[in-house]
């Protein structure tokens, strides 16, 4: 057992003739230097095996981000801080694509021993920015790795915010076919509720069903939506029963009703609507664009490309008529 442990420890050490796992006792500075090198090598090896959720290569946000990382990686490094906008969303702000990018604030403790090199791949870059990207339906593999990422980011720094970017159809596919159990969404939701970090949720495409619940479960005031994204809430669907006995179908139907009631209660809690209101709108699929989602309480802010400032500068109609010398007759 000791020999196995020694062998595994040796495999983590840098391959250098000047380094020894047992530094001479006569040199304290050499021992401290060797210990620091060992810790760095151990952290680097451990971080290299962090699991990542599957990524859709056709996703528009990821495609744009990957293009920038490939052509201008220096624009993603040493970015200035902008706390008002979640990280990497400024790639949509100008045709130059991040000509003045915003820095992703990182943990000081983590940065202390990190090499200043670009992340090796796109998933690593997202995780480096404390971003959990949900870009596929909530199947078991996606749920497992999203929960693992949330736990890892909290362990890394429980004070830094975690960003969840959502473009998911929940537990169904685009055509409405059920591909996952409702428990997949509840598992991620329960993990969110256990976090000590602030959770910033952003809908960058679609948030349907359980994905809409995750969008609304972010920290109040930190729930965002892109201008043309969609959100939709609906009742849980019964999976295909096939040749299942009638008694088993009845049991499954009761479970679906239970999941529906839980979903209604959670949406009521996070949107500020009554249980009756949520239950009524969920009788049929209830689609919401960004303004409607904000009105319903799913999000707090729409990430416009400067339109908010433009709209704020528009002169009200009454003042415009007054300046133009137009008198309104009632």
UniProtKB/Swiss-Prot annotation:
It is found in: Plastid, Chloroplast. The keyword Cell membrane does not apply. Its main location: plastid. Coiled coil: none annotated. Keywords: Chloroplast, Plastid, Transit peptide. Residues 1-43 form a transit peptide. Component of the chloroplastic Clp protease core complex which consist of at least 16 proteins: CLPP4 (3 copies), CLPP5 (3 copies), CLPR4 (2 copies), ClpP1 (1 copy), CLPP6 (1 copy), CLPR2 (1 copy), CLPT1 (1 copy), CLPT2 (1 copy) and 3 copies of CLPP3 and/or CLPR1 and/or CLPR3. The core complex is organized in two heptameric rings, one containing CLPP3,4,5,6 in a 1:2:3:1 ratio and the other CLPP1 and CLPR1,2,3,4 in a 3:1:1:1:1 ratio. This is ATP-dependent Clp protease proteolytic subunit-related protein 3, chloroplastic. It comes from Arabidopsis thaliana (Mouse-ear cress). The gene is CLPR3.
């Amino acid at each position: 057992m000791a020999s196995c442990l020694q062998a595994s420890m040796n495999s983590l050490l840098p391959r250098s003739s000047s380094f020894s796992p047992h530094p001479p006792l006569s040199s304290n500075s050499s021992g401290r230097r060797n210990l620091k090198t060992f810790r760095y090598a151990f952290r680097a090896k451990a971080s290299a095996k962090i699991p990542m959720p599957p990524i859709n290569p056709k996703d528009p946000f990821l495609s744009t981000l990957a293009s920038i990382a490939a052509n201008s990686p220096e624009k993603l490094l040493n970015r200035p801080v902008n706390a008002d906008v979640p990280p990497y969303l400024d790639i949509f702000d100008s045709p130059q694509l991040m000509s003045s990018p915003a820095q992703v604030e990182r943990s000081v403790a983590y940065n202390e021993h990190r090499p200043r090199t670009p992340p090796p791949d796109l998933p690593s870059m997202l995780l480096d920015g404390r971003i959990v990207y949900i870009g596929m339906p909530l199947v078991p593999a996606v749920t497992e790795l999203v929960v693992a990422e949330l736990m890892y980011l909290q362990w890394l720094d429980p004070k830094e915010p975690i960003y969840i970017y959502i473009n998911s159809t929940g537990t169904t596919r685009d055509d409405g076919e059920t591909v996952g159990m409702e428990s997949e969404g509840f598992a991620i939701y329960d993990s969110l509720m256990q976090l000590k970090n602030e959770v910033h949720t952003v809908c960058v495409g679609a948030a349907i069903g359980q994905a809409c619940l995750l969008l609304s479960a972010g920290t109040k005031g930190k729930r965002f939506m892109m201008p043309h994204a969609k959100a939709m809430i609906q009742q849980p669907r019964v999976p295909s029963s096939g040749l299942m006995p009638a008694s088993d179908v009845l049991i499954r139907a009761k479970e679906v009703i239970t999941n529906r009631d839980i979903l209604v209660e959670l949406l009521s809690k996070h949107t500020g609507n009554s249980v009756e209101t949520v239950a009524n709108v969920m009788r049929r699929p209830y689609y919401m664009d960004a303004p409607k989602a904000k009105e319903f309480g799913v999000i707090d802010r729409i990430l416009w490309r400067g339109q908010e400032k433009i709209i704020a500068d528009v002169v009200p109609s009454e003042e415009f008529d007054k300046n133009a010398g137009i008198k309104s007759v009632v």
